[in-house]
A protein has these predicted regions:
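Low-complexity, Ser/Thr/Pro/Gly-enriched N-terminal "stalk/linker" regions
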Residues: 2-89, 114-134
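Extended ligand-binding groove/face enriched in aromatic
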Residues: 63-83, 100-203, 207-264
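Catalytic-core region of carbohydrate-active enzymes that cleave or remodel glycosidic bonds
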Residues: 289-313, 336-386
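Beta-strand-rich binding/interaction modules
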Residues: 478-499
């Protein structure tokens, strides 16, 4: 438990609950789904990402003693080069790698991190400022364009990496570098007359500062995070002021509205999710963190409204979010196109961050349901099964033009999905006052400290392919504990047995969690069984793109149909209403997965005599089809894919 959380013990009663997530290093994946993915990311993804950073010239920007070379990424109309935030990719890679080190020491990875840290320390300015672009290219322009140039965003990701590396290894060098950088920001920004009253347009440093506070216990770090969130959206806008100081007309801002960066009004007044999707999710994650630390009901209330707006009006069935490429974000409510979906991997990952944080201050299954959806669908689709190829955009329909890439012009997503998976253990359990909240299911063993009681909790399950879960309790001495077990929102029928006896738990369910309070001893078991029928999913009528279409879901997994399995474009399929679909475990599909099989109809394109249109509908012929988990698509032969299928 972090120092700040320890200090909270014995304080005044709080307005809402505060669960403490288990440290990810205390959860080990023993078998099954997440062991396979975790091993791949640790053994393949982490080393190849460092290789790509080197091959693409990213590491060269840290050669502070050399003159800055030609730009690897040109300046865009906004005035931003992707190179402005190269530092953020080092930070996320270090963070992802660090999460693997405590349980799986790797001297080679540590040496690579230490080499980056040495260069960052060497290049840091005397006053603590740290940004490779401005130090090497434009030191006179630092802090002159918070609206466009991502200075604090990059420092935030470096800070997250520094915290993770310190927690994994105990090495303070990187942490101390970043504390000096934060000291500089504290000296530069704030409401005092001699400071700049600004904040970065790309949120990230806010949540990073909370992580730092939980390590240092320094109230200045929490105060700075609070300032950045409180100041956001204050009018007149700081961005207008700094634009005029640069000799620019604020009206020439390329995105025209500060809603792009959620700076159009104070955060507590915002009720609709707008703008750049990743920025929004990072901001809302920080708001949840500050509600947690400051016991701030106004921030929690704002988060609640924003969460309901997102999940009720703007979220893809896969957990993807942000339909538009033009602003990498949101347009209007119910605008959820499939083939042009942007649905950036980073945004889905960040929704996972936010959802998890919300569950710590309000144990509501709707937050955990969102976390589970992105984990098994809209975030996991961002990385290939071999751990070396990626999606930036996660479309829900393709005619074969979408292929995974080994790196990207703007490679923010690879390191983001990597850090999500390598830190996955923290999302499974939380503890509070003799309670253990079980959020997620998957084969693992966890070691938990529940108010001084050591608990070893082991999950045996083939989840998400099977709904049976066995929880084995390991205790050195009997103890009275409450288990709060998440009943997923997709589950309409569940059974729970405790110590060999099935129980009626319906009355104990509160907001999607079943509470079981008993005296427990070593060897006791809880068995859960979640029925997993294949379900047909339909979109709200306002989502015009999905009219007369159906999607398939089984448990938490969303399915798609891929041309590789049916030999034709799935866009020609007509799914027969109420036709049965059968789940089957296919051990040969990319490491093994449950597929869905059924009979449909196919529109015959062979009898059109070269015509594009005619007055009679196409003839239909029987067609067997197979659907695979959405997160596995584009791992095999090139071809079309579709999530929302036409229903006949």
């Amino acid at each position: 438990m972090s120092s700040s959380l320890k200090k909270a013990a014995g304080s005044a009663p709080r307005l809402f609950e505060r669960y403490v997530p288990v440290d990810h290093t205390r959860v080990s994946f023993d078998a099954g789904f997440w062991k396979s993915w975790s091993d791949t990311v640790r053994d393949v993804t982490i080393p190849t990402q460092h290789m790509r950073l080197d091959e693409e010239g990213f590491l060269e920007v840290l050669d502070f003693d050399k003159p800055a070379g030609p730009l690897a990424r040109p300046i865009q109309p906004s005035g931003l080069s992707m190179q402005h935030f190269f530092d953020s990719d080092f930070g996320k890679w270090i963070e992802a790698a660090s999460y693997t080190l405590k349980n799986n020491p790797n001297p080679d990875v540590e040496a690579k991190i230490d080499a980056i840290v040495e260069k960052l320390e060497h290049g840091q300015m005397a006053d603590g400022y740290l940004n490779s672009w401005f130090i090497r290219r434009e030191p006179e322009k630092r802090w002159t364009n918070l609206r466009d140039l991502h200075e604090m965003y990059s420092m935030g990701h470096l800070l997250e990496g520094a915290v993770a590396y310190y927690q994994a290894t105990g090495k303070r060098r990187f942490l101390d570098v970043m504390i000096r950088a934060i000291d500089h920001i504290i000296d530069t920004f704030g409401t005092e007359p001699d400071k700049l009253r600004g904040y970065d347009a790309h949120e990230e440093i806010e949540l990073a500062l909370v992580k730092l506070y939980r390590v240092t216990g320094d109230p200045r770090h929490l105060k700075l995070a609070t300032y950045f969130v409180d100041e956001r959206g204050r009018m007149p806008s700081y961005y207008d002021e700094e634009a005029r100081l640069r000799g620019e007309d604020p009206a020439d801002y390329v995105y025209k509205t500060y809603s792009y960066s959620q700076a159009h009004m104070p955060v507590r007044e915002q009720t609709q999710v707008v703008g750049h999707a990743v920025r929004a999710m990072y901001l809302f994650s920080a708001m949840a963190d500050l509600a947690y630390e400051n016991d701030d009901p106004t921030l929690k209330s704002a988060c609640d409204q924003l969460f309901d707006n997102l999940t009720g009006r703007q979220l893809y069935v896969t957990g993807g979010l942000g339909p538009s490429a033009s602003n990498e974000g949101f347009t209007r409510e119910f605008d959820l196109p499939n083939e042009t979906a942007y649905a950036e991997t980073c945004a889905a990952v960040a929704l996972g961050f936010w959802s998890h944080r919300m569950a710590q201050i309000d144990l509501d299954g709707k937050f955990t349901d969102a976390l589970e959806t992105v984990l098994f669908n809209g975030a996991l689709s961002g990385i290939s099964r071999d751990g070396e190829h990626y999606f930036y955009e996660n479309v829900l329909e393709s005619h074969g033009q979408n292929r995974r890439w080994k790196w990207h012009y703007c490679p923010c997503c690879p390191t983001n999905i990597a850090r999500f998976i390598t830190s996955l253990g923290q999302y499974f359990y939380s503890v509070k006052n003799g309670e253990v909240a079980v959020h997620l299911y998957g084969a693992n063993t966890a070691e938990l400290d529940v108010d001084g009681t050591f608990l070893r909790l082991k999950q045996d399950t083939a989840y998400p392919w099977d709904g049976d879960v066995r929880l084995s309790v390991g205790l050195s001495a009997p103890a009275s504990l409450t288990f709060r077990l998440h009943i997923p929102g997709w589950c309409h029928k569940a059974r729970i047995s405790v110590k060999g006896q099935e129980i009626d738990f319906a009355a104990s369910v509160e907001k999607g969690y079943a509470a079981i309070t008993l005296d427990w001893k070593d060897g006791d078991e809880i068995r859960l069984s979640f029925d997993m029928p294949v379900e047909r999913v339909y979109a709200h009528p306002a989502v015009g793109e999905d009219a007369n279409r159906v999607a398939f879901k089984r448990g938490p997994v969303v399915y798609c149909v891929e041309q590789a399995d049916i030999g034709t474009e799935p866009q020609r399929l007509r799914i027969i209403r109420d036709a049965a679909l059968k789940p089957r475990f296919d051990a040969d599909l990319l490491g093994g997965a449950v597929v869905l099989e059924g009979d449909a109809l196919e529109a015959d394109a062979g009898d059109w005599s070269g015509k594009l249109y005619r007055t009679s509908p196409p003839s239909l012929k029987p067609k067997a089809f197979k659907a695979i988990p959405y997160h596995l698509w584009a791992n095999r032969d090139e071809g079309a894919m579709q999530v929302w299928l036409t229903e006949e």
